[in-house]
From Swiss-Prot:
InterPro entries: ComplexI_NDUFA9_subunit, Epimerase_deHydtase, NAD(P)-bd_dom_sf
Protein name: NADH dehydrogenase [ubiquinone] 1 alpha subcomplex subunit 9, mitochondrial
Keyword set, alphabetical order: Acetylation, Electron transport, FAD, Flavoprotein, Mitochondrion, Respiratory chain, Transit peptide, Transport
Subunit composition and interactions: Complex I is composed of 45 different subunits. This a component of the hydrophobic protein fraction. Interacts with BLOC1S1. Interacts with SLC2A4. Interacts with CLOCK. Interacts with RAB5IF.
Superkingdom of this protein's organism: Eukaryota
Native source species: Pongo abelii
Positions where N6-acetyllysine occurs in the chain: 189, 370
Record lineage: Eukaryota, Metazoa, Chordata, Craniata, Vertebrata
Modified residues (N6-succinyllysine): 175
Keyword Thylakoid: no
One Gene Ontology term, aspect cellular component: mitochondrial matrix
Keyword Electron transport: yes
Length: 377
């Protein structure tokens, strides 16, 4: 009897093993592989994993405009050399903008020609975005806008660079009251002399998430009333969106007919400074209390910020630039000639100004704010 019971146990165990094997086989056995036909494989741009043939050195890539230019170059499969002088942690945000090994970071010295030569010698495109809103003990406006661009242009020409793009300013003028804009004008001339085929980009004031244009005006609410020379009734501004500028620069790289030309990048609308600042405060849901401050008094206030040990909120030169009307340059090609439709300020202002709202108005609809009044002067 014991033997019979033992045989039944063995039989049950053997059946259990076979059942387990069958179940495991049925679970692990997946569906048959789908047979792909070449016609079914999606075609199109390869994105960051493609190869555009562009090897670009971008000076000033760690700045406001630079991050957008690097991103647009990276997303089309370009190899980008990024010279930097800052801490390595300040360039971390650029690393995901290109495929593995496509972004090369090299330390450089702006006053060392061998250092400049090293970062441009293997490139077919060089883009100069170097800029500074205020002068320091180490670099004044002449260094930043004249001497350094001249050296980069000369060494790029010697290295056989095919395209050189230099970013200036719409209001660059040798007779300007702004030292910033005077040196921008001289910089254009020395770059053109050193690299005759250079493409010069002349944008107006650029706005975007990290700008010093909309954010600067919006932060005035901390001081109570908003000082404006002549209340802003004598100044006209035509700001341009940072993404449009970066796309225009990249399209100029790809355009064989752009060599040797100057481009004026402006937004689609012109505004009186008063109406523009009023709109900025309306989007930020802040009380707008303008008061006329004579420019000589405004410069005196700016001088106080200049001598502080912190980053200056405003400088005397910025006061001048703030109250200079944006030029109209109809003889120069613009964004439209490079296939870019300029973005109105009203579509993107909320992206920049939402952080200036109080919690009560954080999610308020932008439709409740009237668009800024435009002018045609």
């Amino acid at each position: 009897m014991a033997a019979a019971a033992q045989s039944r146990v063995v039989r049950v165990l053997s059946m259990s093993r076979s059942a387990i094997t069958a179940i495991a086989t049925s679970v692990c056995h997946g569906p048959p592989r789908r047979q792909l036909h070449h016609a079914l494989i999606p075609h199109g741009k390869g994105g960051r994993s493609s190869v555009s043939g562009i090897v670009a050195t971008v000076f000033g890539a760690t700045g406001f405009l630079g991050r957008y230019v690097v991103n647009h170059l990276g997303r089309m499969g370009s190899q980008v050399i990024i010279p930097y002088r800052c801490d390595t942690y300040d360039i971390m945000h650029l690393r995901p903008m290109g495929d593995l090994g496509q972004l090369l970071f090299l330390e450089w010295d702006a006053r060392d020609k061998d250092s400049i030569r090293r970062v441009v010698q293997h490139s077919n495109v060089v883009i100069n975005l170097i800029g500074r809103d205020w002068e320091t003990r180490n670099f004044d406006f002449e260094d930043v806008f004249v001497k350094i661009p001249q050296a980069i242009a000369q060494l790029s020409k010697e290295a056989g660079v095919e395209k050189f793009i230099h970013v200036s300013h719409l209001n660059a003028n040798i007779k300007s009251s702004s030292r910033y804009l005077r040196n921008k004008a001289v910089g254009e001339k020395v770059v053109r002399d050193a690299f005759p085929e250079a493409i010069i980009i002349k944008p107006s004031d650029i706005f975007g998430r990290e700008d010093r244009f909309l954010n600067s005006f919006a932060s005035m609410h901390r001081f109570g009333p908003t000082p404006l020379g002549s209340l802003g009734w004598k100044t006209v501004k035509q700001p341009v969106y940072v993404v449009d500028v970066s796309k225009g620069i990249v399209n100029a790289v790809k355009d064989p007919d752009a060599n040797g030309k100057s481009f004026a990048f402006v937004g689609p609308n012109r505004y009186l400074l008063f109406h523009l600042v009023k709109y900025i405060f309306a989007v930020a849901h802040r009380l707008f209390l303008p008061f006329p401050l004579p420019l000589f008094a405004y410069r005196w206030v700016a001088r106080v910020f200049e001598i502080s040990p912190f980053e200056p909120w405003i400088t005397r030169d910025k006061v001048e630039r703030m109250h200079i009307t944006d030029m109209k340059l109809p003889h120069l090609p613009g964004l439209e000639d490079l296939g870019i439709q300029a973005t109105p300020l009203e579509l993107k202002a909320i992206e920049v100004l939402r952080r200036h709202r109080t919690y009560r108005w954080l999610s308020a609809e932008i439709e409740d704010v009237k668009p800024a009044k435009t002018v045609n002067i």
